[in-house]
Amino acid sequence: MLETTDGKKVKIEFGSIHEFVDYITKTPLNDSFRWAKLSSTSSGSYWYGTKSFEEASDLLKYGWPDMSEKLNTKLKAEGKMEPAYVSKIVYDVQGFQPIVPLYLQGVPTSMVSRKKVVMKQKVITINKDVSYNGGTTTDTMMEESIKAFRIIKRLETQGYRVNLNVCLGTKRWPSSNGNTSEQYYVRIRVKSANEKLNVSKLAFPLVNPSMLRRILFRFIEVYPSVSKSFVNGYGYPADDKDMKREFDGITLPAFISTDIDKIKNLEDIKGLKI
């Protein structure tokens, strides 16, 4: 867990799902939320995505098999992105320049040529913003998150190694003079570049509304410095530009307006409207 404080702005980063779950389950409620109605433990499954905080925690820790099956069906039909190529010098029977010593020895592959090969093993960091406001429907949250899943799948298919983070930004409701002051930005590593794409593991943090409405809100309920101004509504969501400013890597906005089928390469992803 890495904490950075800049005045009233606090940035907290967790290196893994395990580290984050350990923190929110072992840290007591803060003074502001100790006697408040908690989103993390509220009843009702549709808006929250799960029936309880315990169910949400288990799905985050152990995977979401039911959604995994549905996602795998969608991802099987996923078209590949255009591969990223690099130019490599090779020896061939044809080329643009002879290698005289090899030619004199009668070696067939005595010409210098260039060959395009798919670029492999480039590591990139993707930050998925899940800072949705309370009026965002469960269906919309799931649709937007599935778009992100498709993008990650395409990148991995193309040969990129992806560090994937889920991010929340929330601010104190502005005062009459427009001052928001208190802000919290949370980033959780849900997939490291050295891990293969595990659909079951990523299904919950990327797709289930409980990731925000129970799990991430639980962080707000326990983080010690959160003030009472967050109790009713958990603050208001930071925008994608805030996320891009606070965290290194490529930001996937909360709402991806671009047609996913038109995203053909990494530059298209970097160019998503923020």
Regions found by a protein language model. Give the residues of each.
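Acidic, low-complexity intrinsically disordered regions
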Residues: 1-125, 130-146, 150-274
